Amino acid sequence: MILLDGKALSEKIKAEVKLEVEEIVKEKEITPGLAVILVGNDPASATYVASKAKSCENAGIYSVVHKMPETITQEELLQTIAMMNKNPKLDGILVQLPLPKQIDTTVVLEAIDPLKDVDGFHPYNVGRMVSNLDAFLPATPFGVMRMFEEYGIELSGKNVVVIGSSDIVGKPMASLLINAKATVTVCNSRTKDLKAHTLAADIVVIAVGVPFLLKEDMVKDGAIVIDVGINRLDTGKLVGDADFEGLKNKCSFLTPVPGGVGPMTIAMLLKNTIKASKLREKRENRC
């Protein structure tokens, strides 16, 4: 079994990003900039945002974290996004999810300039992604695709099962796999006989937030398993949606948790921010 080491690959990508930033600063005399909006005091979100800011700093990307109270109104949040859209020094804008219940997440995501939408959640970018056109791709599925590429995993003609149909991972993951000419089945909580689907799969991508859902007897010998899930047990241990110990002697490729897909998400966010910085001139020249 080959371990898909997302931590090592993410460090490689971050080093590439740092070089790209240096080139942009030298050639265009601009510093790529990213704004992160954090609403409320959720500890997990705060930790994740801090990690994003640190990664930006290490890569030479200017970043600002805009903290807003849990009680903020939707109008106040939209006004903040509007200001960021107009700020030429900010190439990327992302809103840390989830948002409080008084906020309509769809309206907020649609308010972000599509050319600054480094999370790839704006309908403009989602549509372009589905149509296999150039777009900002959601960072986690983007990271998984980069992992396939790095390890020489062929997707064309392969049977791939995606377990989970979220807007953040499942749906975009399926779209990217379809564009890569894979035969894709998407399973959700209503799927009957999940095991029958996974046993027929060459590759399984799981992202549901249920510890150890995918077990050894659910995949065929030599299957590839990409575990996007991250769950904290009562013991404090972090585990994935797949039973790593049970699967490690049956799979040909397997991602660990932690250290698999997780580190790739921030690395690909940095890649998207660099992409956005290269669109700065295009944004400024719009009517």
Curated annotation (Swiss-Prot):
Enumerate the Gene Ontology biological process terms.
L-histidine biosynthetic process; methionine biosynthetic process; purine nucleotide biosynthetic process; tetrahydrofolate interconversion
Work out whether the entry's keyword set contains Ubl conjugation: no
- EC numbers, comma separated: 1.5.1.5, 3.5.4.9
Gene3D superfamilies linked to this entry: Leucine Dehydrogenase, chain A, domain 1, NAD(P)-binding Rossmann-like Domain
Binding-site residues, NADP(+): 164-166, 189, 230
Keywords carried by this UniProt record: Amino-acid biosynthesis, Histidine biosynthesis, Hydrolase, Methionine biosynthesis, Multifunctional enzyme, NADP, One-carbon metabolism, Oxidoreductase, Purine biosynthesis
Q: Which domain of life is it from?
A: Bacteria
Q: In which pathway does it act?
A: One-carbon metabolism; tetrahydrofolate interconversion
Q: List the Pfam families hit by this protein, alphabetically.
A: THF_DHG_CYH, THF_DHG_CYH_C
- Entry keyword Lipoprotein: no
Per its UniProt record, what InterPro entries does this chain match? Aminoacid_DH-like_N_sf (IPR046346), NAD(P)-bd_dom_sf (IPR036291), THF_DH/CycHdrlase (IPR000672), THF_DH/CycHdrlase_cat_dom (IPR020630), THF_DH/CycHdrlase_CS (IPR020867), THF_DH/CycHdrlase_NAD-bd_dom (IPR020631)
Please name the GO terms that the record assigns under molecular function. methenyltetrahydrofolate cyclohydrolase activity; methylenetetrahydrofolate dehydrogenase (NADP+) activity
Substrates-to-products reaction catalysed? (6R)-5,10-methylene-5,6,7,8-tetrahydrofolate + NADP(+) = (6R)-5,10-methenyltetrahydrofolate + NADPH; (6R)-5,10-methenyltetrahydrofolate + H2O = (6R)-10-formyltetrahydrofolate + H(+)
Q: Describe the function of this protein.
A: Catalyzes the oxidation of 5,10-methylenetetrahydrofolate to 5,10-methenyltetrahydrofolate and then the hydrolysis of 5,10-methenyltetrahydrofolate to 10-formyltetrahydrofolate.
* Family named by the database record: Belongs to the tetrahydrofolate dehydrogenase/cyclohydrolase family.
Q: How does it assemble?
A: Homodimer.
> What protein name is recorded for this chain?
Bifunctional protein FolD
Q: What organism does the UniProt record list as the source? A: Aliarcobacter butzleri (strain RM4018) (Arcobacter butzleri)
The gene designation is folD
